[in-house]
């Protein structure tokens, strides 16, 4: 059997200034929204002796109309799964799962020099890009067999590999040119696992499960990247015993110790 799934998305967004809500609540309702002052793009702004008061309540309409913040993103998620039963040994099957998650996006921010948040710095501009992709590979073999209608074995062993990558590039600048900031940030890591499991049941009543995992990640130091995790569990299906089968008040009863 082969299953394939894929989903993509492209989005374009424009973001308003969230501070406009608080500014609308605090703004003096007796003042006009527009007063023709060309210094602020025709919008009203508080002044003292002809100078802009940066700590005064901002004009909420100007905050919404004069800020430009747009973001564009592309996302793609997909996986393919192959499940194969061997003809020469029908109790044995192989399962392979390949997956990916990719995303890229850009964001632009611009405050003109006439805007309430850009006036002091002669305007502001910013740019950010984000690239992210994750890859996944899972593979395991599973063997299940019944013997004499009393013994059931289910044995599985596999390998898992994951890759995580993210990079961000960011730049902001006041248009007077005296305070530019930028940075590039990248992260990359891997997660690798080897795992196995053995299930045994006798007469579908008495159960034993043993598992073993060996996980390693590049996020830890070289001396501490790997961890071994064993576990054992015992089970007893009490409902399958003769003294419980005729007890209709109990639909299922199982004791498990691990």
Where are these regions (language model features)?
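Flexible loop and strand-edge segments within Gram-negative outer membrane beta-barrel domains
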Residues: 1-56, 67-75, 116, 121-132, ...
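Outer-membrane beta-barrel transmembrane strands
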Residues: 4, 13-15, 55-109, 127-147, ...
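One face of beta-strands
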Residues: 4-6, 230-234
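Outer-membrane beta-barrel translocator domains and adjoining extracellular loop/strand segments
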Residues: 16-21, 107-114, 167-174, 221-226
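Extracytoplasmic loops and strand-loop junctions of Gram-negative outer membrane beta-barrel proteins
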Residues: 58-67, 119-126, 177-183, 214-216, ...
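Secondary-structure transition/capping motifs at alpha-helix termini
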Residues: 88, 146-150, 202-204, 235-250
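Signature of Gram-negative outer-membrane beta-barrel scaffolds
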Residues: 170, 175-231, 250
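Acidic/histidine-rich catalytic neighborhood
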Residues: 252-258
